[in-house]
């Protein structure tokens, strides 16, 4: 009887814990990289506007391949 309880107690614990844990880590990394790396990249571009002008097009291509990343970076760079 105790074995059945242990087995039935583990399965519900794993699925219940995995969805929330996956959601939280996913949300944090997405928002953090979107703000920090992008602002840094855009800041460095503002330091070298002449050199970054041609490179901006390449950066956009790289951002596009990433998907959601390009949206964040585009807003940051456009605001520049």
Curated annotation (Swiss-Prot):
Pfam families: LCE6A
Amino acid composition bias (Polar residues), ranges on this chain: 1-10
Positions of the UniProt region annotated as Disordered: 1-21, 35-60
Entry keywords, A to Z: Keratinization
Ribosomal protein found in the keyword field: no
InterPro entries named among the record's database cross-references: LCE6A (IPR031716)
Annotated transmembrane regions: none
Origin superkingdom: Eukaryota
GO BP annotations listed: keratinization
Disulfide bonds: none
UniProt similarity note: Belongs to the LCE family.
Note in the entry: Belongs to the LCE cluster present on 1q21.
Function: Precursors of the cornified envelope of the stratum corneum.
Listed name of the protein: Late cornified envelope protein 6A
């Amino acid at each position: 009887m105790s074995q059945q309880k242990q087995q039935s107690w583990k399965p519900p614990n794993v699925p219940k814990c995995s969805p929330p844990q996956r959601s939280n880590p996913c949300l944090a990394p997405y928002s953090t990289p979107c703000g920090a790396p992008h602002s840094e990249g855009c800041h460095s571009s503002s330091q070298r506007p002449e050199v970054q002008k041609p490179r901006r097009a390449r950066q956009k291509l790289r951002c596009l391949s990433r998907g959601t990343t390009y949206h964040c970076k585009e807003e940051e760079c456009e605001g520049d």
